[in-house]
Curated annotation (Swiss-Prot):
Binding, Fe cation: 96, 98, 159
GO aspect biological process, one term: DNA damage response
Highest taxon, organism lineage: Bacteria
Domain Fe2OG dioxygenase per the UniProt entry, residue ranges: 78-178
Designated name of the protein: PKHD-type hydroxylase M446_1130
Coiled coil: none
Originating species: Methylobacterium sp. (strain 4-46)
Keywords from the named record: Dioxygenase, Iron, Metal-binding, Oxidoreductase, Vitamin C
Cofactor binding note: Binds 1 Fe(2+) ion per subunit.
The enzyme's E.C. designation: 1.14.11.-
């Protein structure tokens, strides 16, 4: 399941992020890549242990947890501290799959990577190329979103970033461990939640059928959640 979520950050927040990031020091993006990924990764990133990445990352996490669409789709248990990258002309990231487990040396956090996230911080017309191409159960999907929007997709997906041929692609990227390990179960819960919200808008939150379906939703999470 690949899910696009709009306006996680406002345009003003994106502009502020970009001002701060433009003034920071960047390093080779291969510093955080696994052995296989490092062979196909060509970009730059903010040092993960630097103050800029940590402060901006904390703001991203707060925005995520305040976004009902994100929480519904991800059912997050642990969110890895967000990282930040940029792709200039000629930069790309070849086909790869993300590491199954990620560890943060600063906090000691270790997570199973159930979902990968890209939060776009550059408008599509700022650069050519730079599309995220992901292969999942539904085939190959190509994503290039407005600044402030994010895409959420299974970390088990083969994916790549196409070469940037003009301008600069800027983004935050990170992983999360969901309370619900199974992507199929998570997709069912997400679809059910969407149906409940639609019925609640039409019938009211206190309608008997809405209440009954909400109970089914919570019981499914109770059945599948690992906390």
């Amino acid at each position: 399941m690949l899910v696009c979520i709009p306006e996680v950050l406002s345009k003003d927040e994106v502009a502020e992020f970009r001002r701060i990031m433009d003034a920071a020091e960047w390093e080779d993006g291969r510093a955080t890549a696994g052995a296989q990924s490092a062979l196909v990764k060509r970009n730059e990133q903010l040092p993960p242990d630097g103050e800029v990445a940590r402060q901006l990352g904390a703001r991203v996490v707060r925005a995520l947890l305040a976004n009902p669409h994100f929480v519904s789709a991800a059912i997050p248990l642990q969110i890895f501290p967000p990282l930040f990258n940029r792709y200039g002309e000629g930069h790309h990231f070849g086909m790869h799959v993300d590491n199954a487990v990620r560890g943060d040396p600063l906090t000691g956090l270790r997570i199973r990577t159930d979902l990968s996230v890209t939060l776009f911080l550059a408008e599509p017309d700022e650069y050519d190329g730079g599309e995220l191409v992901a292969e999942d159960y539904y085939g190959t999907q190509e994503v290039k979103l407005p600044a402030g929007d994010l895409v959420l997709y299974p970390s088990s997906s083969l994916h790549r970033v196409t070469p940037v041929t003009r301008g600069t692609r800027v983004a935050s990227f990170f992983w999360l461990q969901s309370m619900v390990r199974s992507p199929q179960a998570r997709s069912l819960i997400y679809d059910l939640d969407g149906a409940i919200q639609g019925l609640a808008a039409e019938l009211g939150q206190d309608h008997a059928e809405v209440v009954r379906l909400a109970g089914i939703y919570h019981n499914l999470i109770r059945t599948w959640a690992e906390v």
